[in-house]
Swiss-Prot record:
Subcellular location: Cytoplasm
Organism: Vibrio atlanticus (strain LGP32)
Family as reported in the entry's similarity comment: Belongs to the MetA family.
Catalytic site positions: 142 (acyl-thioester intermediate), 235 (proton acceptor), 237
Gene: metAS
Residues flagged as site, Important for substrate specificity: 192
Pfam families listed in its UniProt record: HTS (PF04204)
GO molecular function, one term: homoserine O-succinyltransferase activity
Top-rank taxon, per record: Bacteria
Keywords linked to the UniProt accession: Acyltransferase, Amino-acid biosynthesis, Cytoplasm, Methionine biosynthesis, Transferase
Pathway participation: Amino-acid biosynthesis; L-methionine biosynthesis via de novo pathway; O-succinyl-L-homoserine from L-homoserine: step 1/1
Protein's recorded name: Homoserine O-succinyltransferase
Length: 313
């Protein structure tokens, strides 16, 4: 089944060119199907690029998904036209009275900023707390994972000396966990962060199920036992060129970034990078939608209750 997005959203043309089935709202409104309602809180600067990346992953599912885009506040954006934000993004006040099947909170380039210094930190905490009462399952990505762990477990920020950048090998820890269904024993995924997520630290301070780790990158995937909060510390949504663009950006700003690991053929930035994580990203999002959202959410979202959810043993 397709994703349902506004007819004029720029991502529509990009995804159609990739032969991805997009159903405009004008057509979807004529079908008697209860789609999953998924909200994306987009914290990334280049919002059009980011929304397209996440919509691509959400599209590869037999479930029909109705996607709405959320902005953190009404401050002007340096990288996204105001017209785009006004036309396609909602403010929190417009959605806080509703319930949603799923919420995705994207990463943000705030790895070296203390939580209390993030200009929208209090507002983000409000949204995360709201999600616990209004959303079946929330997916926290990269920086949002660190923010979510701070809110839910009061974990302090742990920062690496050098930025972690590249494509790393990961090992799954519980092949029978629903989120990992269909995963290979090892898989590749990109990272671009300063945050440090060690398996020992999470095991000591949380009751999370640690699902996948890397010897170099640490914990990649973890979830609460009721699957209502899922944490992804990397960027499965990244396009093949995203790490390259970040590397070139940092060079242009006078920084001395390390060449992303295991990314360029022969470790040469002059070579075109290859996306070796695409199938994993699609499977991760498909499993999240199916096992964490669809199989747990009530048919009537007006009957949403925290008591509806059970924890796996």
């Amino acid at each position: 089944m397709p994703i349902r997005i506004p007819d004029q959203l720029p991502a529509s043309d990009v995804l159609r060119e990739e032969n991805i089935f997009i159903m405009p709202l004008s057509r979807a409104s004529t079908q008697e199907i209860r789609p999953l309602r998924v909200l994306i809180l987009n914290l990334m600067p280049k919002k059009i690029e980011t929304e397209t990346q996440f919509l691509r992953l959400l599209s590869n599912s037999p479930l029909q998904v109705d996607v709405e885009l959320l902005r953190i506040d009404d401050r002007p954006s340096k990288n996204t036209p105001t017209e785009h934000l006004d036309n396609f993004y909602r403010q929190f006040e417009m959605v806080k009275g509703r319930n949603f099947d799923g919420l995705i909170i994207t990463g943000a380039p705030l790895g070296l900023v203390q939580f209390e210094d993030v200009i929208y930190w209090d507002h983000l905490k409000t949204i995360m707390e709201w999600a616990n009462k209004h959303v079946t399952s929330t997916l926290y990505v990269c920086w949002a994972a660190q923010a979510g762990l701070k809110l839910l477990y009061d974990l302090p920020k742990r920062t690496r000396k050098d930025k972690l950048s590249g494509v790393y090998n990961h090992e799954i820890h519980n092949p029978y966990h629903p989120i990992l269904r269909g995963f290979d024993d090892t898989f590749l995924a990109p990272h671009s962060r300063y945050a440090d997520f060690s398996q020992e630290y999470l095991a000591e301070h949380t009751d999370l199920d640690v699902l996948a780790t890397s010897d170099v990158a640490g914990v990649y995937l973890a979830a609460t036992k009721d699957k209502r909060n899922v944490f992804v510390t990397g960027h499965p949504e990244y396009d093949a060129h995203t790490l390259h663009n970040e590397y070139i950006r940092d060079l242009g700003e006078g920084m001395e970034p390390v060449i992303p690991i295991n990314y360029y053929p022969n470790n040469n930035p002059d070579n075109k990078p290859v996306a070796s994580w695409r199938s994993h990203g699609h499977l991760l999002f498909s499993n999240w939608l199916n096992y964490c959202v669809y199989q747990q959410t009530p048919y009537d979202l007006d009957h949403f209750s925290e008591d509806n959810f059970t924890k796996d043993d």
